[in-house]
Every structure is written in structure tokens, then in C-alpha cells.
Amino acid sequence: MHLNGKRALVMGLGVHGGGVGVARFLALQGAEVTVTDLRPPDDLRASLDALAGLPIRFVLGEHREADFRQAEIVVRNPAVPPTSRYLQIARAAGAAIEMEMTLFFRLCPGPILGVTGTKGKTTTTLLLGAMLREQFPDTVVAGNLRISALDQLPSISATTPVVLELSSFVLEGLGEAGLSPKIACITTIAPDHLDRHGTMEAYIQAKEEIWRHQRPGDPVVLCADSPIMRAMAVVDRRPGDMVWFAGAKGSDVYRLKGDRRAFWRGDELIWHDRSTEGSITHTVICTRDDVRLPGAHNLANIAAATAAACAFGIAPEHIRRAVRAFAGVEHRLEFVRELDGVCYINDTAATAPEAAIAALRTFDAPIVLIAGGADKNLPFDAFAREIAQRASAVILLQGSATPKLLDALRAARASVAIHGPYDDFEQALDTARRIAAPGEIVLLSPGCASFGMFRNEFHRGDTFRRIVQSFT
């Protein structure tokens, strides 16, 4: 791809690193780079500082139609919908529309393993990366992780495995470009981002882009516990392409087409495969005693990563070593501290009800739940029922989704004590500390997005951690 001298426009600088990586990459390739973002400079200070000294023009606090008419290539932030009127202007003027990931896929010389899913994708991505690094120490892990993939390109050779976390927003762009990873893995599918996709069907179609453009023989790793993914397997694909995994539910993986599968049988994680001679092999990868991650949902994440690693040819002993060493991911059921007999857990990454339900099911102790926030057009009925069964109290944060959650709690006839909604996070945490009894858990697992009170869910989790650590 020739970029030297091209008029390149980066739409959306952002604060997670992707926009910075794109702008830096384009500038170093000799493109004439303009970065445009609706946010003012003060909101983007860290990103602007990271680009200091590079020949980049910034248009902040607005988008200008003239910039889109003059651009030869527009690289959009995944949060920008493909239907944006500014992108329509650029297309009409003949500009190529790209994203960081479409550029990366076109330029990456190494094999790409992609992971997506409503929940579990970050844990699975990082665990899969750890498994591959046991055998290939130069493995690169990037994607939807606040790590720019383009920044990693100089260190990637034809033999360097690359593990990427891919959101539904990113997959939309990859689908438009006809790009899919060598190995595709979908951890879970449940309602999410319906404010963007509109319908569950459209959301599923976006997730399916991860395998839609694979080559014959490329593996796709699917969850046997998911009726949606079992239905995906009906499409016309060679049976050898299907690799299955199952969590602790004990799904009947043997009835599904395809010879390869990773599943829990009692306390053992089994890899089932067919040799080139046609014989069936069963290998014990690890046991539950090897697992440090909490929660039944993480057993499924381990099985998913194992299935993808085995499909890539990683030896069982390397997988086992990675499982034993892997202690978890920041902002996902992250233990913050214990104070006065109360445990504080940061699960801010639970931005959808399904993820928060999984968090509630992880613990046996009574829970003081901190929930609520911005709406993503998702139902809260199941979340409310789970709260009614497992929480001793719920502390609500202010946001557009919180009235819906309140209505769902009333409909569930939940007898749980309800506090809030709070528009002051410190006040909400002071209440949590006051009402939590020794032996209980204060769990930040909102089931909602963070916008309004926070810049993003990571800001919410960082603030939770800071306030809790300040308690004396």
C-alpha cells in the first residue's frame, strides 16, 4: 500500500491508542496527515502529547466537510458508524475509507488469530496470546485493548503470530474490506450494542464477519453452549473448518460437525482431535486445579483459547503452563482490596447485562452491587432477576439506562435494598462502604455503558480503584 504523499484524514483521535497509532503510522509513511475529532484539545491531551513533534495537522472540536472532500484516504475510528454523513462526503469525492484494522490486515505479514464475542473476548485474547508466547515468544497481542496494532508492525515477520481482539464495530469495517483472520474465535453472543446495530440480527451478522472471508481450511472456533453459534454451523462450510469449545455446562459437543473440540469433562479440560491417519485422540490439557481465574464463565474462556491454540498447533504443555500462570485481566473481576472484612471487586468492563449476570454468579457471598449507567438499548429483565436472587443491596449510578433497570427490578418484585441513583461516584462508594457487612462483596459490575459520568469504562474502573484504595 503506497501512502507517501497521500492526503490522509484520521477521523477520531480518541484516547485508547488506536487513533494515535494510525496517525503516527501514516505520518511516518510520508502521508500528509490531518486528524479531526469532535472533542476539544483538553479531552485529548494524552493522545496529542503522544503525537508531539510529528508533521500532523489537527482539527479539533469539529469536523469540516472540506477536509473530507480533499482527503484521498480516510481512516475512521471504529466508533464512527459507516453511515456517517462525513464518510459519505469522502466516498463521493473518491476517497478510500479504512480503519486501523483494515490497514493492519493488509500490511501484516504474519498469521492473524482474531477473537470476538459479547463477553470473554479480552480474557480469551490475552490468554491465547500467553499460550502462543510459550511456543512463539515474539507473539504480538493487540486490537481492542488500548494497544495500537499498527505500532507493532515493525516487529512482525512472516512467522510472527498475531492475536487480535476484534469488536463488532471493527468487524463491520473488516467485512466491508473482505478481510478475516486465519483463525477466528467467537466466545459468546448475547444482546449488546443494539444502540449501534439496531437489531440482534444485525449484531450477529457483524460478529459473523470474523469468519465470513476466511479461506477454505481456515479454522473458526465456536461455542457449543450457544444456540446462536450452533445455528451458524449450519452454513455451508467444510466440516474440517469447525472447531468447538464448551464450558462447564457439559454440552454434547460430539453431535456437532467437525473433528476438533476443547471441552471440560469433570475437572479436566480435554482436547479431542483426529490424527492424519484418522484415529481419534483425547488429550488432557489441564485440570481445574491449574486454573487461577474465578467464575464458571472463565472455564469457557479457557476452553475457547485452548481450542484456538490447539488449532494453531500449540503443544499441550505450553497451553497448560500458560493457564497455570494466567491470573486475570485488569477491570474484569479484578480484586482491588479487602477492608474491614469486605472485598472490593472491579468489573467495570461488564457494560452489558449478560456480563454483569456472569459476575454475579461468580460469588457465593452476599453482594452489594454497583450498577446502572448509559443505555445501549438492551433488556434488563434477566439482570434484574439475578440481582433479586444474589444481591443484598444495589447502588445505582445515574444514566439513561438506570430508569429501565429500576423498572425491571420493580417488575421482578426484587426485595433488595436500592440506593440512588447517584450522580457522584464517590458518594455512591461511600454508601457501599457504609452498608456492606463483613463477609460481603462490593462489586462494580454495572451492566451498562459509562458515558455521561465517565470518559469510558476504564475511567470508571480506574476511579473505582482509586477511591477504594483511599479508604482508611
Swiss-Prot record:
GO MF terms here are: ATP binding; UDP-N-acetylmuramoylalanine-D-glutamate ligase activity
Q: What is its main location?
A: cytoplasm
Q: Which UniProt keywords apply?
A: ATP-binding, Cell cycle, Cell division, Cell shape, Cell wall biogenesis/degradation, Cytoplasm, Ligase, Nucleotide-binding, Peptidoglycan synthesis
Instruction: State what protein this is by name.
Output: UDP-N-acetylmuramoylalanine--D-glutamate ligase
Q: In the UniProt record, does the keyword NAD occur? A: no
Q: Which Gene3D superfamilies match?
A: Mur ligase, C-terminal domain (3.90.190.20), Mur-like, catalytic domain (3.40.1190.10), NAD(P)-binding Rossmann-like Domain (3.40.50.720)
Q: In which organism is this protein found?
A: Roseiflexus castenholzii (strain DSM 13941 / HLO8)
* InterPro entries per record: Mur-like_cat_sf (IPR036565), Mur_ligase_C (IPR004101), Mur_ligase_C_dom_sf (IPR036615), Mur_ligase_cen (IPR013221), MurD (IPR005762)
This molecule's function is given as: Cell wall formation. Catalyzes the addition of glutamate to the nucleotide precursor UDP-N-acetylmuramoyl-L-alanine (UMA).
Corresponding gene? murD
Which E.C. number(s) belong to this protein?
6.3.2.9
Q: Which reaction does it catalyse?
A: UDP-N-acetyl-alpha-D-muramoyl-L-alanine + D-glutamate + ATP = UDP-N-acetyl-alpha-D-muramoyl-L-alanyl-D-glutamate + ADP + phosphate + H(+)
Pathway in which this enzyme or protein is active: Cell wall biogenesis; peptidoglycan biosynthesis
User: Which residues are listed for ATP binding in this entry?
Assistant: G117, T118, K119, G120, K121, T122, T123
Q: Name one GO biological process term.
A: regulation of cell shape
Q: Which family does it belong to?
A: Belongs to the MurCDEF family.
**Pfam families per the record?**
Mur_ligase_C, Mur_ligase_M, MurD-like_N
Location in the cell reads: Cytoplasm
- Is-annotated flag, keyword Cell division? yes
- A single GO cellular-component term on record: cytoplasm
